[in-house]
Amino acid sequence: MFLLRTTTATTTPASLPLPLLSISSHLSLSKPSSFPVTSTKPLFTLRHSSSTPKIMSWLGRLGXGTRTPADASMDQSSIAQGPDDDIPAPGQQFAQFGAGCFWGVELAFQRVPGVSKTEVGYTQGFLHNPTYNDICSGTTNHSEVVRVQYDPKACSFDSLLDCFWERHDPTTLNRQGNDVGTQYRSGIYFYTPEQEKAAIEAKERHQKKLNRTVVTEILPAKKFYRAEEYHQQYLAKGGRFGFRQSTEKGCNDPIRCYG
């Protein structure tokens, strides 16, 4: 038996919200018909029947349900594992790439002709609204990525893949240089079947070229969590030391990644 308590002084069926009136046939009112505020007696008793799940659903929506921390965690994971539902500008497309620390990766893509916007963030994990500290804990399964917005008429997806391969070593698992952790893994996260096909074919070609196993994961793009403003266009803004690096299209200056 489920019990619903109330502190309302003079509650009657006529004053109940519509959702509760609709289930009044499943409720039995305790006597007396009104209670002092200090009463601890149950106003309603809810007996199990075939419609009990529906009733409990309504009660849950009204804030009187029995959600557990596990339920909330599952909901958050479902959101984080859902698709990226952001919409690019008209005539533009999105692509996501993970290739180590996202500071240097973003600058590399900023320089690609046809790229109109870049953002760094977190994706592929289980935690909703993660922070940088969450990511660095190694417990959320997120990857540091750059989400690229580009004009497919001015920049092919293959051009983005070329930039991706050139920027990092895709044969080292969960590591790029001194940066170690699952957040630094190599990954291509696609939005369309065409992107997926191009990524798989490019990976096969690159593996033959290197004659080593390429560990790059190729997965559907999931919800993108924009990183803190501090990380956005980090090297272009000068980083910690204020040494700005060029974002000019086609620039081939070495990218110096510093904290």
Swiss-Prot record:
Protein name, UniProt field: Peptide methionine sulfoxide reductase
Gene3D superfamilies: Peptide methionine sulphoxide reductase MsrA
Family according to the record: Belongs to the MsrA Met sulfoxide reductase family.
Organism (species): Lactuca sativa
Keyword vocabulary terms for this entry: Oxidoreductase
Catalysed reaction, written as an equation: L-methionyl-[protein] + [thioredoxin]-disulfide + H2O = L-methionyl-(S)-S-oxide-[protein] + [thioredoxin]-dithiol; [thioredoxin]-disulfide + L-methionine + H2O = L-methionine (S)-S-oxide + [thioredoxin]-dithiol
UniProt EC number: 1.8.4.11
InterPro entries: Met_Sox_Rdtase_MsrA_dom, Met_Sox_Rdtase_MsrA_sf, MsrA_MetSO_reductase
Span of the signal peptide: none
Role played: Has an important function as a repair enzyme for proteins that have been inactivated by oxidation. Catalyzes the reversible oxidation-reduction of methionine sulfoxide in proteins to methionine.
Keyword Disulfide bond: no
Gene Ontology molecular function terms on file: L-methionine:thioredoxin-disulfide S-oxidoreductase activity; peptide-methionine (S)-S-oxide reductase activity
Region of interest (Disordered), residue spans: 66-90
Enzyme class: oxidoreductase
